[in-house]
Amino acid sequence: MQYSFTEKKRIRKSFAKRPIVHQVPFLLATQLESFSTFLQADVPATQRKPEGLQAAFTSVFPIVSHNGFARLEFVSYALSSPAFNIKECQQRGLTYCSALRAKVRLVILDKESPNKPVVKEVKEQEVYMGEIPLMTPTGSFVINGTERVIVSQLHRSPGVFFEHDKGKTHSSGKLLFSARIIPYRGSWLDFEFDPKDILYFRVDRRRKMPVTILLKAIGLTPEQILANFFVFDNFTLMDEGAQLEFVPERLRGEVARFDITDRDGKVIVQKDKRINAKHIRDLEAAKTKFISVPEDYLLGRVLAKNVVDGDTGEVIASANDEVTESVLEKLREAGIKDIQTLYTNDLDQGPYISSTLRVDETTDKTAARIAIHRMMRPGEPPTEEAVEALFNRLFYSEEAYDLSKVGRMKFNRRVGRDEIVGPMTLQDDDILATIKILVELRNGKGEVDDIDHLGNRRVRCVGELAENQFRAGLVRVERAVKERLGQAESENLMPHDLINSKPISSAIREFFGSSQLSQFMDQTNPLSEITHKRRVSALGPGGLTRERAGFEVRDVHPTHYGRVCPIETPEGPNIGLINSLALYAHLNEYGFLETPYRKVVDSKVTDQIDYLSAIEEGRYMIAQANAAIDEDGRLIDELVSSREAGETMMVTPDRIQYMDVAPSQIVSVAASLIPFLEHDDANRALMGSNMQRQAVPCLRPEKPVVGTGIERTCAVDSGTTVQAFRGGVVDYVDAGRIVIRVNDDEAVAGEVGVDIYNLIKYTRSNQNTNINQRPIVKMGDKVSRGDVLADGASTDLGELALGQNMLIAFMPWNGYNFEDSILISEKVVADDRYTSIHIEELNVVARDTKLGPEEITRDISNLAEVQLGRLDESGIVYIGAEVEAGDVLVGKVTPKGETQLTPEEKLLRAIFGEKASDVKDTSLRVPSGMSGTVIDVQVFTREGIQRDKRAQQIIDDELKRYRLDLNDQLRIVEGDAFQRLARMLVGKVANGGPKKLAKGTKIDQAYLEDLDHYHWFDIRLADDEAAASLEAIKNSIEEKRHQFDLAFEEKRKKLTQGDELPPGVLKMVKVYLAVKRRLQPGDKMAGRHGNKGVVSKIVPIEDMPYMADGRPADVVLNPLGVPSRMNVGQVLEVHLGWAAKGLGWRIGEMLQRQAKIEELRTFLTKIYNESGRQEDLESFTDDEILELAKNLREGVPFATPVFDGATEEEMGKMLDLAFPDDIAEQLGMNPSKNQVRLYDGRTGEMFERRVTLGYMHYLKLHHLVDDKMHARSTGPYSLVTQQPLGGKAQFGGQRFGEMEVWALEAYGASYVLQEMLTVKSDDVTGRTKVYENLVKGDHVIDAGMPESFNVLVKEIRSLGIDIDLDRN
């Protein structure tokens, strides 16, 4: 088994019972794949598939002018490389994007040419089409300097859907069926029955019209319409009555209205008897072809065809007319014998289309189309062209209507066709097929669709959403181009004169900047980043809205299995509308979610893995991942629990066709990080998965002792750690950079065999948490590709580490852990276990105002020297300065408007100069309630403005760092080259050289070492071939030096050019403060099982409950928090964590007494290989075993995978191994070793009962009391009501609401009440009066009129009631 560099250092013991069949796929794959399909940047222009940008271009181009003599064709497009890299874009507030240029061809045809079109001239040119934001390697976008994520959207798939209203519309509870054809873009077409069973259609939810209008509009006559929907009864008219052609199945179940006889007149069915199967058999036996029926049997039936008099050509009766006695008379007169009527019955053949035809007043195709035109464009005159154009544009035009590949596939599948491809517009037979199925449904045949089935909902990813926006922009451009193409020839225009890229740029900018699906990335910790990118939302443009979404859409559906997580979704109004992808889920080419299954053949599980979509899955019998199998992969049990079409049942193994790949298949990343998830109630698991995303990265991350084994995947895929691109040897490491000399076999010939990784140091995340990377390799370490070189925020040795492992005791403690409060030991705070660093960005801009430019300077009058002490000569604070609320960070003055001066002031000005008074101090100060250390300053200066010293110094430092990187690369390149050179030169014969090297001498190592390396090139060799390769090496080194000089020059140019700043801004300074937040009462904390609480007290270490050996607990939780919430997983985690730490202490004790390596090996084998997944400890050298043991002293990390975790028995074994009987007895443990005797820290007395004690991974959440604490003395007031504003952001007051007023009223505190309602709220004169009184030392309140009373008076007046105050 292969262990990576970091895995070797600390193996996580897994309790999984099942081997890993299928690796967890790369977690950000959906985002990255979708966007690369959209761009197709690395694909040669000729080989691009018709998707993404290519599809958008080809769908809009060629653009033809109105007269048809000029057209603009699209050839190909290209993306330039971005001007700034990701980091520079973040610092400068720019968008990380690339310029899109399209090569287009303008073709002008000769108007004079009499016969077929002749090309007059062709112009080809590259045209700038706007900027396209690029995705970073971690799946986010940098827009205006901030990282954003485009969330995937789950929307209704295009296609056709049949449903009914569940009996809610009509009071009788009758089911009203409806169908809807949804295109990808274009008009929606709905069909619906009304309570009278007449079928209507509507376009885009407009007025409804009888469906036969649409059928006539597509060219069907009433006869053809009836022929499409009904079967006919054939009658032959006799002198008396008629003969009915006998069709057995149409008679069954009917009541005979007359005696039915056979040929010989024998009665087979008596009158008023129901016809049953025996009667029909008798009729068939009698070889009945016709049945004689009386005249009245025909009355009320409906004719199927027009009946025409053969002689005169007169229409006697039309199709869909009822047969009446007069009609029969006319028929007999005209001598017509054979007539056809519609066969209908009340059970399964209703007369719906026939009755609809009756309601329909249109006569022919033209009239029908005019009716549709009136409905779509009321008020417009229906000219022939307009009517035709509108009807064709609705469903038949490729520009306006697109069913899309998905829509066509879904449509054909639903109407039962075999082929899944076809035209992208609607066809006549599509409309007919839909109506037929709808009528069948009304007749009681077939099933309606389930809209919440994942086969009917598809995911639109970044690429597709961006493509739609881009196409929208292109369509806007197309309109403008069409206008100008007419003038192209006469004015000799080039393609770039025709195309204006503004509409495209603005469409793209609007989408990435302000669309509902483009969200500010949640960057609190690595897990929140991953989860945000894997999120699937039903909201957004073209999706649902919170208010309209009902219960069904939000609910968990059987098809979510393995595709969408049933647990992770937000609490509150968005519940169920925002979901997370399951661990193994993947999108197919149509955008439907698929999940992998193992193929089972003849009850034997094979290695073949198939991805099935929700529709395909419904056809198979699928076993769960925990089904028992033997070594050969055969299913052992007689009955296996399995699913088919969403139902769970027990079946025999031979019926199983597929099996789940892993037990964790059904949950998302966040939920699969919860150990013992299977023992938690789902509601609490939901809170647990949501709260892990809010965990603040601690100063020293600590791996969870009880994990699930997915932590490493999570940390590595999130991109917060640094991974090696290529294997090699670590050449140099410091806190900020790692240099790796690449292995020869991985280096590409001719390129620098050096990888330099610059680490991110103390950078602010979107949520103001700190992102900092720390190297975990040493010089000389051998690393291979993909190994973790540096830990990021919240990762520890390449594993996700969101919190800290705390020793937790479940017991009450003097009411301090009442109602989920948390009691914490002072030691936790003293050890900085939960200390986190938050970085605040403060910026100030110097603008050019009407009265002159603002200036950033140290020279500010009327500020004490103390306040300016931390500023340098440019007026900007030093890095490293510790500042508090109100301190000046950047000095800035703004010119003030000239005021009318008194003569005295004029005199003073004339004497002392005028600088002092005409500017006001607008410096950047630290906001209230904030303090910290300045860790970075950035200065941006507009092009053409003199840089100050500070800005210049920042640029020089940056260049120095870059030069260092280049020198390292050069050093390694030259080192390699000279090593190769030495190997080549030693033993060669020389013709001469430096230091008087005689001709014919053999070169040896000593001679080379004596020379300076560069003089080696002066050696003249006898061997021509060797001389040539000497020259080649010299040239390659010089070439590299030249390249490095160019790169440095490029960097210098980039840094020294002016910065792009918003209009009117001359200079911008950003100051970054690092704020240290220690744990304090009021902070919110939580475990991973939804067990959240607020710190109530931090207790001195001596007062905490302690064990017999004197070790105190870290955290005391209330045991009452467990039973009612049913999250028992936390108790199991505590037991297993106790064992993990116990094993660590035993390993530590062995290392301390310097036990033999063999003893360590035996103990480790006992831990790792006696249960759960086996580890290959044999392959470890003694040194590696020793390093592993050293890393395990703080606890052996366990992995208990979701739904496949540690059993009670395994936990028992681990506890026995960790606490031998002598230690257990000393600590006063119970027989199962999971409870301990504790002593009260304040009295020293032993508690009566043993206490559950152990280690739990506990998190500090991003709800810190520091961010919420707020106090106000005087502050801003609302304009109308004159009451103080609310909230911390507005520096507002506390609301004294209705109920609080009642409390004072009930108490009778009239004086306090008056003060609250007047001077402390909105009595304007009163509040100034109070201030005056206080200054005078007179403590009385003169309460006046509250402003809100005036507002009330004004409101009453607005109703037209004159109300006035009698002020006497």
Curated annotation (Swiss-Prot):
GO CC aspect terms: DNA-directed RNA polymerase complex
GO molecular function: DNA binding; DNA-directed RNA polymerase activity; ribonucleoside binding
E.C. number: 2.7.7.6
Annotated keywords: DNA-directed RNA polymerase, Nucleotidyltransferase, Transcription, Transferase
Reactions the enzyme catalyzes: RNA(n) + a ribonucleoside 5'-triphosphate = RNA(n+1) + diphosphate
GO BP field: DNA-templated transcription
Family: Belongs to the RNA polymerase beta chain family.
Protein name per Swiss-Prot or TrEMBL: DNA-directed RNA polymerase subunit beta
Organism of provenance: Burkholderia cenocepacia (strain ATCC BAA-245 / DSM 16553 / LMG 16656 / NCTC 13227 / J2315 / CF5610)
Gene behind the chain: rpoB
